[in-house]
Amino acid sequence: MKKMLVMVALACASVFAVEAKALKVLMIGNSFTASAMKQTPAVAKAMGCELDLANLCIGGCPLQKHWANVEKAGDPSFLPYSVQMSWTSCDEKKSGLRKVAPKGHANIPQALTAEKWDIVTIQQASGQSAFYKTYQPYADNLIAKIKELAPQAEIRIQETWSYAPYDGRLTTWKLTPDEMFEKLHEAYGTLAKKHNLKIIPTAVAVQNYRRDLPVKYEKIYTRKELAAFKDPQVPEFYGDVCGKAFWGKGSSWNKDKDVHKLRMDPSHLNPSGEYLQGCVWVASLFGVDVTKCTYRPAFVPEEKAVVMRKAAMAAVKGE
């Protein structure tokens, strides 16, 4: 494990070899890249960096499904990805980015050839990230396809983070959040080493922040206890950047979407976590020191933002 930590640290720290000020980045991902769309553009702008960012998104999409979608892309009508875009280099409506999603959706080969991307990112679905056997052979196949269709692009891997303690999958896997991190960290490191790819270490930054704040869960409520909560009572996440709880109706995919109830999301970053993710991405992509960033969203207090920026930089530098 120690050798893996050193290897991943080197993969992360090497991003400072070259500093860029303008990049076109395509993310082949899911909701864990959708969250990168929230604050990364604003952090990049504050750091004087020009970032054109596009996200091919299917919620919860694993590498296996991404590759299956590539194999189906011979049918030009097969456009399974919604596309989120942040385009700063020119008017989005006049830019080549519109080629990515002429009908509002896209497939991977089409998107890869629509622009001269500087960087293309991949990642495993969070629910499979701790188990390297789920990566293959799909990661190898996807990497080969990216190299074929976008040979000018550097491929990077976003290391997705471990869940907050309330996620029931941790119980199924018999893992704590820290143990989930250790396993996914090793899995991503194995893939990076195999293909000599750099890592965007979002997971490490989340761990750094949890340690440095620190985040200590004083009470984990049982399902029975949570069922007894009354609006507006919600469980505490103790400052964690992952996880949130609220009262309201569900999302479109929830069977009880029309029911007003306590909703919990222990796997995605909350708004504060999205700022941390943005700092990691900008530091990693552009090789800049985000501890000097003067931007923070209004909902993140300055003292908390300082901890986040330091956690992000330490992760990217491999410290």
What are these regions (language model features)?
Residues 254-310:
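Extended, basic/helix-rich recognition subdomains
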Residues 1-4:
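Positively charged n-region of N-terminal signal peptides that target proteins for export
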Residues 35, 42-50, 59, 123, ...:
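Structured segments of extracytoplasmic/periplasmic soluble domains
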Residues 26-28, 158:
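Short hydrophobic segments within beta-strands
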Residues 22-24, 52:
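Residues that mark the start of a beta-strand
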Residues 104-271, 283:
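Alpha-helical cap/lid subdomain in secreted, periplasmic
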Residues 34-139, 164:
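Conserved SGNH/GDSL esterase-like catalytic core that processes O-acyl groups on lipids
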Residues 9-17:
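Hydrophobic h-region of N-terminal signal peptides that target proteins for export
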